Amino acid sequence: MTNKPFSPRNIFAQPSVNSSRVFLSPQRYIQGPGVIKNCGLYLSLINAKNVGVLASKRGFSAEASNVLQSLSEAGIEYSKAEFMGECSREEVEKHANNLLNSKPDCILAVGGGKLVDAGKCIAHRLNCQVGIIPTLASNDAPCSSISVLYTVDGVKDLVEYFPQNPAFVIVDTEVIVNASERYLVAGIGDAMATWYEARVCEDNPVGSNLVGCRPTLAASAISEKCAQILFEYGVSAAENVRHNKNSESVEKVVEANTLLSGIGFESGGLALAHPLANSYTEITRLNKKYLHGEMVAMGTLAQLAMENSEDLEKVTKFFIDIGLPVNLEQLSMHPLKQFEINKIIDTAFKNPLIHHMKFEVSRDLILKSIKKADELGTSYVCKYGDEAYRRLHG
């Protein structure tokens, strides 16, 4: 079993070639209605004979049951591992130890973002490949070679990197459209940050992606396409999912949330939006009430405010239309609660990714950016209303 941390920067970001460009992606991406029923067939591509299936208790009685049936039909043996809800070191080590004796040649992670990240961690420890079957389009975790681990209380703990991206990602849009609209919208919030952060890394001569190298043209193009798809199809896709209906808009947005954003953030790079979003997890009540993409949305607005970007108003209006938070009140915070805001700023300031911005970032600048975005969001709520947000948040 492998417990040694992996650092891609030690491989790719050597001082002698510090201007190298590196592109990462999953080996295979499969999306469409009903594809989950063919996962046994897809596993034949990697000659899998013995699989560890990670799912929640609910998942094993729902989507994962189709996975198990497909594995049985393909003659693939499997062991079940029940995920308890938090991608923590304790949860990962427990499942890695329990699955060790069965010697799986692949881990299948069937579920949401934290389960997906746990599956990647488990596969790394067991020295086997990982296949991802997301049941939500709420974040861009499925395609990357990265996992975010949290404490048992849900506070961000650390980021783990892996030598390989998933062997395949299987996205069944029949499953996605039967989940809550709020999950798709949160995924849009996560994915919208991709272009704005990648753009910063591309424009900054010392900006880098998540393996410490310069972004490729492909990563930048994919990131930009991601934002274009969201602006054009996001509102209609959310409306379709609200009625559990698949459509071309849904297919496009699911691909943007999952594949385009997944490649874009890892190969294109991060800037302020994600470090700020991850800092919101320092406030316990936010962990319990809000999804990752909803916090990323607020981080994106703050980053655009910091840049004095002409896109700030466009993105704020889009977030209002789709139902994402645009001010601190919609994230159960208040601009006058300086202690909480300072805690978030202090955590974000420790993250080296914020220095991908093309100018020096100070605590005071982060504070001013948060407040600028909050004030614009508040004024836009007064002007355009918050019907979509209230519908999603009851």
What kind of feature is each model-predicted range?
Residues 2-15, 309-394:
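C-terminal charged capping/lid subdomain of soluble metabolic enzymes
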